[in-house]
């Protein structure tokens, strides 16, 4: 390990010190079952470059992409080392899955490279290195407001269903903590293997639990589409079992497939493509153009777009030179108006503070399915970092 870290530091010093090109290495799922999210990373980055130009503080920007099709900490670590040693990147970014970000974080200080997390959502990631900054969200951040929504709906008994990995456990813990404070009861907590694709038995367990509603988190992709379809197909909606989830369950790219059966499903999330603001209109136009298929645009794109903004401020602060500590220090407390709304980087946690929205699947005036914003929970930090 020490040999690897020494090589990282030496490689960065020799390859980047004289460069007028600042290289950014982006690790994400650009093939395989989660490739739509990888495409959204790239679309968000391309949108930022299209609207702001590919030069910052006199330095040309070059983005290098590396593919991790599904959660693979070993591959992510290997690719990060390659990006720093071979390609000479000054910044690492992307990271769709928490285990991948966790695997790379220990390399950052010796390599003198900041990491900008554009999606991975376990609270603890930012505690693994002082050089981690997050522009996405956390499960605690998005799940906690939903407990208030559920309580106000008069629901007293809930079953939680999550994927069995870091973000899922965070979502389960956050919801349970908040819901019990509201006077509710979690009657059962189900943790599903990441590879789960048959949800009919899960739906039967939900029915048998006696819960009035379910709260769910799974990573956006084939699992979430399968879960929401199973909720409808197995009669839970008809039986009156209410559906509550984080927005990961209803990405815009899934809505046309889910169709009218999904109308009315409510989620809490930090972004909706339908968000009404000048900043979002410009972003959506540029990101959809970059994607090629407008229907695929989803939240990972805005995490990547804002990640590029943060990296640009780091480059300005360092003059394009490799100084990870100075780069991160420069963005602590940074605030701006994102396509998602007003945001800032918490100077203590280096996590993004942002609005969280209650959304409902609806149709717009043109008959397109959207996540319609109903309510705003302003300036949400990360409750999951309390006491850490």
Name the predicted role of every residue range.
Residues 36-41, 51, 55-126, 135, ...:
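Beta-alpha junction/loop-to-helix N-cap segments that form part of ligand/metal-binding clefts
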Residues 69, 77-78, 122-124, 128-234, ...:
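Extracellular/periplasmic Venus flytrap/periplasmic-binding protein
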Residues 15-19:
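Sec/Tat signal peptide C-region and signal peptidase I cleavage site
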Residues 228-305, 316-318, 322, 365, ...:
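Extracellular/periplasmic periplasmic-binding protein-like sensory domains
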């Amino acid at each position: 390990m020490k040999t690897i870290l020494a090589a990282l530091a030496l490689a960065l010093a020799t390859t980047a010190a004289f460069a007028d090109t600042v290289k950014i290495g982006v690790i994400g799922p650009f093939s395989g079952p989660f490739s739509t999210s990888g495409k959204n990373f790239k679309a968000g980055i391309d949108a930022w470059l299209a609207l702001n130009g590919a030069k910052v503080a006199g330095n040309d920007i070059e983005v290098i992409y590396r593919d991790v099709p599904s959660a693979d900490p070993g591959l992510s670590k290997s690719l990060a080392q390659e990006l720093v040693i071979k390609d000479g990147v000054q910044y690492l970014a992307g990271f769709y899955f928490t285990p991948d970000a966790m695997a790379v974080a220990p390399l950052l200080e010796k390599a003198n490279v900041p990491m900008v997390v554009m999606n991975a959502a376990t609270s603890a990631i930012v505690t693994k290195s002082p050089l981690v900054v997050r522009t996405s969200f956390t499960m605690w951040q998005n799940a906690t407001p939903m407990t208030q929504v559920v309580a106000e709906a008069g629901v007293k008994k809930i079953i939680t269903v999550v994927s069995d990995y870091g973000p899922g456990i965070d979502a389960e813990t956050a919801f349970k903590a908040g819901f019990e404070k509201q006077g509710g009861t979690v009657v059962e907590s189900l943790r599903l293997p990441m590879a789960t694709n048959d949800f009919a038995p899960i739906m039967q367990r939900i029915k048998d639990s006696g819960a009035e509603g379910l709260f769910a988190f799974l990573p956006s992709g084939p699992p979430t589409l399968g879960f929401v379809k199973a909720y409808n197909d197995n009669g839970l909606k008809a039986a009156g079992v209410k559906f509550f989830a984080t927005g990961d369950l209803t990405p815009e790219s899934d809505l046309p497939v889910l169709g009218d059966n999904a109308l009315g499903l409510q989620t809490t999330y930090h972004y909706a493509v339908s968000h009404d603001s000048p900043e979002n209109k410009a972003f959506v136009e540029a990101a959809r153009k970059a994607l090629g298929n407008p229907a695929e645009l989803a939240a990972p794109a805005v995490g990547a777009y804002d990640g590029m903004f943060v990296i640009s401020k780091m480059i300005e602060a360092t003059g394009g030179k490799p100084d990870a500590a100075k780069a991160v220090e420069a963005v602590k407390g940074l605030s701006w108006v994102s396509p998602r709304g007003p945001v800032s980087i918490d100077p203590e946690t280096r996590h993004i503070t942002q609005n969280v929205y209650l959304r409902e699947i609806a149709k717009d005036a043109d008959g397109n399915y959207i996540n319609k914003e109903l309510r705003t929970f302003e300036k949400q930090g990360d409750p999951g970092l309390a006491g850490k």
